[in-house]
Regions:
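SAM cofactor-binding core of SAM-dependent methyltransferases
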Residues: 2-75, 141
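Short aromatic-enriched loop/helix-cap "lid" or pocket-rim segments at secondary-structure transitions
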Residues: 51, 76-80, 147
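General structural signal for secondary-structure boundaries
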Residues: 1-5, 9-10, 166-174
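Internal catalytic-core helix/loop-beta-alpha segment
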Residues: 66-122
Length: 189
């Protein structure tokens, strides 16, 4: 079982609503555990595959998949060309638009898709205080370690880090630090 699935299995009891960047096995697991899931996916083929799989009665109505068109993508959903930059900027916000529309309160955010730094910063500012943010592959990707400038890791599961949204962290995320993160909104890693 992957680190991500293990972490979700441990932490899912604390929420009934999850924001997810990058859909897959975790989407299915969360739905089967009874969570409402707002999931965003960059690969059209994968989006079709996951939504087809989620048509069953167990998950119907609980999972809201959003296709984020960021242009042509590779097999992992990463853009192969940087010309649709406006779409890159919308990607981190798309699930939060749905959250606000549906008046939901997510207590868990799962980052396993594209633009993880941008999605982390967006989620850190949008999620309620006390919410947990899981970021897959955190330790093996040193670019992600910028997060440590304002957020404190609360748990580690293999290569996955868990962070809690705190007021102190939000206060540390000042203008200068936000500017250092601004390029992450255009970087699909």
């Amino acid at each position: 079982m992957s680190d991500l699935i293990n972490a979700i299995d441990l932490l899912v009891q604390s929420t009934d609503c999850v924001v997810e960047y990058g859909s897959g096995e975790s989407t299915v697991l969360l739905a089967e555990k009874g969570c409402t899931v707002i999931s965003v996916e960059t690969s059209w083929n994968y989006f079709l595959k996951i939504t087809e799989r989620l048509e069953g009665p167990i998950v119907k109505g609980r999972v809201h998949c959003i296709y984020a068109d960021v242009g042509t993508v590779d097999q992992w959903g990463s853009p192969v060309d940087t010309s649709p930059r406006a779409a890159f900027l919308r990607y981190p916000l798309q699930p939060w638009v749905q959250i606000e529309r549906r008046e939901l309160t997510p207590r868990l955010v799962v980052l396993d898709g594209r633009f993880r730094l941008a999605c982390f910063v967006t989620s850190f500012m949008k999620a309620p205080l006390g919410a947990l943010i899981l970021i897959n592959n955190f330790y093996s990707r040193t670019d992600y370690h910028l997060i440590n400038h304002f957020a404190q890791e609360s748990e580690r599961v293999g290569d996955l880090a868990v962070f809690e949204v705190t007021e102190k962290g939000r206060n540390m995320l000042d203008t200068d630090l936000m500017l250092s993160f601004s390029s992450s909104f255009l970087n699909p890693l």
